[in-house]
Amino acid sequence: MNLDRAIQVALSAKRMGHTGPLSTGESLTAALVLNRHDWLTEMDYTIAQALDRIDEDTIPHLADAARNVAEGFDHD
């Protein structure tokens, strides 16, 4: 998943207040970007398991996506 998509799924989940219709990989990415340990727990994943489950090419974008979301970047 590229940076723009990681930001997009995180913002979508943030707006909904949950991961809703997102795929498992997208949901885990959103939870990691938004630092939502409660969502990981609800999905029965640890941080390590989530990192193992998401696409390998997504991992380098997590910190940048979190920074962009925290700064109010809106992909839409």
What are the language-model segments listed below?
Residues M1-A30, L34-D76:
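Charged, low-complexity intrinsically disordered segments and flexible loops
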